[in-house]
Amino acid sequence: MFKNFGWVILFCTIIIGMLILYECKKHSRKSDSAKASFWAREARANTVRRKDISNLNYINIPDSVIPSDISDDEINEYRTTLLNLQARKILNLSGLTNTDLKEKYGVANLSALSEYDENYITLVNIIARCGARLIEIGNCSLAAVILEYGISIGTDVSRNYYMLAE
């Protein structure tokens, strides 16, 4: 009865090994295909000529969201940063990869667009921290103005929403 049991185990082991080998090769083919697709798209994106970016939806910081007449060192730092950002170009490019940016606007614009996106990231972080500090020092009305502005420009900082809800 147990005489053929060894053969059964050997047969099952071989079948399982072949299934594993098949799945590994299938995964490898898919991975190679995805890599080739990525690099082909990247190569196409690298050939796109510079496009006009002057008419993009740039974010402007209104004076009404810059805290003034508040004697708090932390708020003064945020004010300085906001004033510096006010003079710069700011774009919300969240959700776009470098390849997406190169395809849409050309390789030559990538560094400028990256800078504008970094300005946006700085802005939304400053808005969240400034709003939190204003709440700490009891200026909830100005905090609400700043946090609502953050939401209006598309911030995804969940803390803004929580602070406004409170």
Please give the residue ranges for each predicted region.
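N-terminal alpha-helical interaction modules that lie
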Residues: 2-124
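Hydrophobic/aromatic side-chain positions at a characteristic register within alpha-helices
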Residues: 115, 134-135
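Structural register within alpha-helical repeat arrays
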Residues: 129-130, 164
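Short coil turns that delineate tetratricopeptide repeat
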Residues: 154-155
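TPR alpha-solenoid repeat register
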Residues: 159-160
